[in-house]
């Protein structure tokens, strides 16, 4: 698999991770603009786009995350096109999460106090033609500058890509996850328990259109859709289940 590491000059966490990735001899493609404001014309063709990025939240909680970019609604204020999602590789996302958790639990990194989690689809870029993922250090400027956090991300990237390149990973079902909060606690837990390879994730509050649902089932390889039954409103559950049944899409409660 051909892949491209992408770093933004506007992003301190991105620059931090870039430094560590380059220290291991890997090339990094650098852009002047924010990664979330980029689009497919900014990059050479690749089979996988990996954005080295910061994560920001009001809580400022130390967090390491991985997710695929995309806009689930008409709101594209954070980059990308309205109601468009980039392709997703659930094996990459899940192995990356597991490897970040592995390194984060090592004795030399435990005192950093980071959480590890997925995030749902949000922000750009959305028009990429190959799978993409953001790997992020959060959630404030203090964490963005931590070398050990960048080292966790870098080691996790190397392990993940080596596993994929050498097909050194177990065969498991691949799923799309619907429901829950922004950090997808249900699906993060399932991935860390190594039950599935989990790709696209959407939150409880999203009102998914048929356009988005069709993109999700066409832009990711999957075996079934996992529905966080307690993590959705009743009317949305009925709507999504009806769509999946009408289109012969396998789904399960999780």
Curated annotation (Swiss-Prot):
Gene3D superfamilies: AF0625-like (3.40.630.50). D-aminoacyl-tRNA deacylase with broad substrate specificity. By recycling D-aminoacyl-tRNA to D-amino acids and free tRNA molecules, this enzyme counteracts the toxicity associated with the formation of D-aminoacyl-tRNA entities in vivo. The keyword Zinc applies. Keywords: Hydrolase, Metal-binding, Zinc. This is D-aminoacyl-tRNA deacylase. Residues 65-84 have a biased composition (Polar residues). Monomer. GO terms for biological process: D-amino acid catabolic process. Binds 2 Zn(2+) ions per subunit. Residues 61-85 are annotated as: Disordered. It catalyses: a D-aminoacyl-tRNA + H2O = a tRNA + a D-alpha-amino acid + H(+); glycyl-tRNA(Ala) + H2O = tRNA(Ala) + glycine + H(+). Belongs to the DtdA deacylase family. HAMAP family: Deacylase_DtdA. Its cofactor is Zn(2+). Its EC number is 3.1.1.96. InterPro entries: Deacylase_DtdA_archaea (IPR018033), DtdA (IPR007508). Pfam families: tRNA_deacylase (PF04414). GO terms for molecular function: D-aminoacyl-tRNA deacylase activity; zinc ion binding. SUPFAM superfamilies: AF0625-like.
């Amino acid at each position: 698999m051909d892949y491209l590491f992408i770093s933004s000059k506007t992003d301190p966490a991105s620059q931090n991770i870039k430094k560590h990735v380059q220290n291991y001899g890997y090339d990094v493609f650098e852009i002047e603009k924010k990664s979330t404001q980029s689009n497919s014309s900014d990059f050479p063709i690749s089979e996988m786009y990996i954005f080295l990025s910061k994560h920001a939240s009001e809580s400022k909680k130390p967090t390491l995350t991985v997710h695929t970019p995309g806009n689930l609604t008409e709101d594209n204020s954070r980059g990308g096109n309205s109601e468009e999602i980039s392709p997703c590789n659930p094996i990459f996302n899940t192995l990356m999460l597991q490897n970040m958790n592995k390194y984060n639990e090592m004795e030399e990194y435990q005192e950093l106090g980071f959480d590890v989690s997925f995030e749902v689809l949000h922000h750009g870029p959305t028009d990429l033609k190959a799978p993409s993922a953001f790997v992020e250090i959060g959630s404030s400027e203090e964490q963005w500058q931590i070398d050990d956090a960048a080292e966790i991300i870098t080691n996790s990237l190397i392990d993940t890509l080596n596993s994929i390149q050498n097909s050194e990973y177990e065969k498991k079902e691949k799923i799309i996850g619907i429901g829950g909060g922004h950090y997808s606690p249900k699906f993060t837990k399932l991935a860390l328990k190594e039950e599935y390879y989990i790709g696209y994730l959407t939150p409880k509050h999203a009102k998914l259109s048929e356009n988005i649902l069709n993109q999700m089932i066409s832009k990711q390889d999957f075996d079934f859709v996992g529905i966080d039954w307690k993590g959705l409103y009743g009317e949305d559950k009925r709507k999504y289940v009806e769509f999946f049944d009408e289109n012969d899409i396998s789904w399960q409660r999780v």
